[in-house]
């Protein structure tokens, strides 16, 4: 069964938004890397002083392996992520009659 992972990364959202355009190729490579190690779905959202990440992964272990990459951690900081650890919520993905 897959898992949903929601991460709240505090940081500079203007810098992050700018990086989405200026470093689009790097974001695309990271997406391909995540798919290669068990990432199924991914979305970003921007709030007041934070970036929200909503992912679906094959397992929590796959997500943890992906996030442990030092190059990814450096990239997060470069695109506006605060040095403090993000808030992470993990839940088992379930199927429901109202799913769309």
What is each PLM-predicted segment?
Residues 1-73, 82-100:
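Short S/T/G/P-rich N-terminal loop/turn motif that feeds into the first structured element of a domain
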């Amino acid at each position: 069964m897959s898992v949903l992972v929601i991460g709240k990364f505090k940081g500079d959202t203007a810098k992050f938004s700018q990086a989405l355009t200026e470093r689009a190729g790097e974001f695309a490579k990271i997406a391909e890397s995540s798919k290669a190690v068990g990432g199924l779905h991914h979305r970003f959202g921007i709030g007041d002083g934070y970036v929200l990440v909503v992912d679906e992964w094959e397992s929590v272990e796959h997500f943890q392996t992906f996030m442990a990459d030092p190059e990814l951690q450096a990239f997060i900081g470069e695109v506006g992520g605060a040095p403090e650890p993000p808030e992470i919520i993990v839940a088992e993905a379930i199927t429901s009659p109202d799913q769309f």
